[in-house]
Amino acid sequence: GYSHRAATRRRAKALGIASRVVGDLAAAVRTTDLIILATPIFTFEQYFQELAGMVPPGCIVTDVGSTKLLPHQWADQKLGNAARYVGSHPIAGSEQRGVEFARDDLFDQARCILTTTEGTDRSATKTLKEFWAALGCIVRVMNPIEHDRVFANISHLPHVMAAGLVNASDEEDMKFAGKGFLDSTRISSGPASIWTDVVLANRENIADGIARAIAELSKLQGAIRDGKRERITELLETARR
């Protein structure tokens, strides 16, 4: 493995997560068949540029970021033909990060989305399907545009909505919060720096989702303000389905 942080390298080896971890990127990738980037999304462009001059012929490069259109564009521009890029998005993990939270069952029955374009190498896609399946994942392939639209709705929008709910709540009131509130807002405790990258990398889809959410909340707000019982029930029942 590779990490530019010495503390991370020491921790990974101490926990037995990696047998070899180095701080020199060129040394880490010189003879590798597969590279997986697990860094903030906006670091990918620079890594692709560096890797283009380091990787052996035929090497596959992937990532585990939750947005995919920009990484595909950067890979085309920076990696070119130096390596074969396929996007990966394993739907696993939690709001926690760091090698100390590694688990051997992390990918058991988890969905993993591979993203491809017309120019994606088919054999690289096949290899990655087999790789993620071997870890226990259920693999599906999408194009990056569809991926980013879907995950704006089911992953990124819920995160910003949770953040909005927390920010709209009084800190003193939250001392009395029960399981319902905590379940609704848990994801907002993910690292802000990571999520800022996600939001900016998929900003158009997320902004559209926020607009739809505001429209739905406005309907409910109006019904509540006007005391329209049937309309409130209708809106809540629609969500319950």
What does each model-identified segment do?
Residues 47-100:
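Rossmann-like NAD(P)(H) cofactor-binding subdomain of soluble oxidoreductases
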Residues 18, 32, 58, 109-110, ...:
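Short, well-ordered alpha-helix to beta-strand connector turns
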Residues 172-240:
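Interdomain hinge/lid region at the active-site interface
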Residues 25-60:
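Rossmann-like NAD(P)-binding element
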Residues 1-17:
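NAD(P)-binding Rossmann-fold cofactor-contacting core
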Residues 19-24, 140-141:
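Short acidic-hydrophobic, aromatic-tinged amphipathic segments that line or gate anion-handling sites
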Residues 104-189:
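Internal alpha-helical scaffold of NAD(P)-dependent oxidoreductase catalytic cores
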Residues 4-5, 39-40, 64-66:
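Short beta->alpha hinge that forms the Motif I/post-I loop of the SAM-binding pocket
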